[in-house]
Amino acid sequence: MLMRKIRLNISLTILFISFHYGIYLQVEEKDDIETQEITIVKSNKPIISNIFKIRSNPIISDSLLEEKFYIKYDHISVPVVSTFIPNKASPLKLQKQESSFLYNSYFSWGYGNQSQALIDFASMISIDRNQSMGVDFIFSSLGNQENKILRSQQNYLAASFLHLFKTNNYRVESSFKFDRRHINFYGLYSDYDWTNIPSFRPSLIDPEQNLNYLKINSNWEWFNSIVKKIRFNTVLTIDYFDNTEQLINFDSEIRLPVFDFYLELKPNLSYVNTNFVSSFRQNVPLSNQTSLLNLDFQIVNLGAKTNFKFGTKVFYLLGDSIEKTNIYFFPKVKFLYKPSYSSLSTFLEFDGDFNLNSFTTFSRINPYIFPSLKLRPTNIPYKGRLGVKNSFNSGLEFFLAAIYSRSESYPLFKRLPYVVSNNNLSYNMATSYEVVYDRLDQLGLETGFLMRFNEHNKFSINTKYVNPESFNEISAWNLPSIEIDFEANFRFFNKIYLQTNGRYIGRRDSAYHPVFLNAEFFDSKPEIKSLDAFLYFSSRLLYQTKSNWAFFFEFKNNFGNNYSRWAFYQDYNNNFLLGLRYKFDIIF
């Protein structure tokens, strides 16, 4: 009985203490409302004692009869003593930052001396996250030169459309381009009195030549496939005299991993179809159709210190050809060694090549070629380069290489003689060039230097010196012994951009045929006329305003005693052009 009373008293005492402790916690919660602690307990986390209990059926309350329960919070304002001491220094002045937006389009136009004109428009618009479409248009013109008997103005027009599609696996770039180059055969001999030549009637001569090129390209590139690239392009060329030429080229690249190496295959197909209205001497139509199949087979190793490629090139010639054989084999070796302790690497390249020539290719190099050519492929049995190159972290790169090549049928631009029975055609006035093929050996040096100061400031210069030696012709016509190309880009104060490029062409020999008044001498050996070296220089200065407008100034000049790439075709000198550029967005 006594034990029962003791247990009852202990139970009542524990119950009393628990009750007062609960009241004390509630008071503490009301007094300290600013500090709340929330404990998140995962739902339906049974303990061992609840596992075997019978769960009661859930009861859904009647929302029509039960009143909504509203939660009210009582906010108690508590005075706070601030300990913040303000800084006595003067406040910083906010400076407005210049906005640098990227635009997808721009339009430029300019005008300068010698009747210069320039119109330039370009736009690249994103259709969606994978596709982009672009358009580019440019037109430039130059007026007549002084003291020229025949017209000498020229202009250039180009319009192209581009479509780009890219994903994580591949990239497709397709383009459609039309460009037209309008020139004149005005390069008459300057040491003749043309008024005393009866067969020369300038009032009846039309020196015009229009070279029109229509080009379609489609380039496919895969990132994670054995087929790396597929390229297709076709070119249709039509000139002022209704001569036509069609080029088709298809090539691909396949790379197969084999152990620690790669097996690389590059099949290629080239096709040339040329139709000339009239030949130079016989005045009869001249046509040529040639196809070339090519397969490059090589093994590639890309190592940490040593990279090498070795294999073979196979060519098979089809169609109209005067070559001795239709099948050609050439070795191909590329080797590069870079030690781990140095940034200097040594490289060796040795291979051969076989190329189809075309009126399209020649006219882009020399627009004053005769509008009828004898086309032959160029056979290069071997060519090699041996040298060193270096790349520093500071942005400096350079290379030095010794070069040698032998060509069995190298194309040379040789000046044609004056034709007495010229039919008032300007290209018969000793103003045009034919293409002759000769064996040519070239031995020399190549150097290159590139300095990248940062993203917008860089300077590069490349030099090539060779000693061309021909075998059948008395000189390697119009091949300079030294060529120097340089380019520089600089930005100042984030507003001023300077672009400069130039080219130095050394001395070279040109064929010179004396003019005979009453007889044709097609087979007479020409004299050698040495052309002086000259330097072509072009510079563009652009000032970008805070708005979308920019002002630019262009300067072009030639330096030398006889500043012309081709004999008696004096280039324009001291050209100035001032223009505006406006950037904007095109949104669909």
Please give the residue ranges for each predicted region.
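Membrane-embedded beta-strands of outer-membrane beta-barrel proteins
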Residues: F121, A159-F161, I216-W220, F250-I254, ...
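N-terminal periplasmic/intermembrane-space "pro-region" immediately following the signal or transit peptide
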Residues: I6, Y21-Q97
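Outer-membrane beta-barrel transmembrane domain signature of Gram-negative proteins
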Residues: R201-N219, N233-A304
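Outer-membrane beta-barrel translocator/receptor signature
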Residues: N87-A89, E98-N147, R151-L157
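Short loop/turn motifs that connect adjacent beta-strands in outer-membrane beta-barrel proteins
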Residues: Q95-L102, I127-N130, K166-V172, W222-I230, ...
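Exposed, low-structure sequence patches enriched in small/polar residues
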Residues: L102, F107-G110, K305-F588
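Surface-exposed extracellular loop regions of Gram-negative outer-membrane beta-barrel proteins
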Residues: I125-N147, E264-N268, V272, S287-G319, ...
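Flexible loop and strand-edge segments within Gram-negative outer membrane beta-barrel domains
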Residues: L142-Q154, A158, E173-R231, V235-L247
